[in-house]
Amino acid sequence: LREPVGVVGQIIPWNFPLLMAAWKLSVALAAGCTIVLKPAEQTPLSALRLTEIINNSNLLPEGVLNVVTGFGEDAGAPLAAHPHVDKVAFTGSTEVGKLITKASAGNLKKVSLELGGKSPTIIFPDADIDAAIAGAASAIFFNHGQCCCAGSRLMAHEKVFDQVAEGISKIASNIKVGPGMDSSSEMGPLVSDEQFKKVSGYIESGKSEGGEIIAGGKYDNSS
């Protein structure tokens, strides 16, 4: 028997807020489910506007598509634990995914998790090195590196290591950083001060552990 699962709680991240909302909403609506969407606290406006447009179209009955905003502990956790929510779909960190799985056990609701990872990009000596360098750089820097599948762990065979390092360094050094709304910018700011401090911490950690910076590494933390 195939039938709608019921009320679906959908919790989405901040790195692709509009796209993630569209992905989550479309399949649940197509399956005949009602939805409570919880966007990330850093990026709620795109989800609010999208659902406003959909609800104003009068294509859905009132109450089918709903949005709650707020921090995880205030909005996400109650949604995951609510006894009248039949399924939770979450995209985000592994740590939060574990908490959602635990919270969902109260009524044995269905759970689907799309969690982040850091599987490495590996370049072998028989690869098309120019293409591999371009692809690896794109995997590292796409969306400012704010991607759950970002290729920021890169391993290259010793025979091509220096060539790969030089190529990635050259690409990184030539990226134009600027305001996100400036069409000439190739990379805008990170999503929040919290994320900036986290990334800066990774740089400092690498330096303290003997890592060599081959491009960039300087940043302004005055504001």
Give short role names for the model-derived ranges.
Residues 63, 95-223:
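ALDH superfamily catalytic-core signature
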Residues 1-131:
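Rossmann-like NAD(P) dinucleotide-binding subdomain of oxidoreductase/dehydrogenase enzymes
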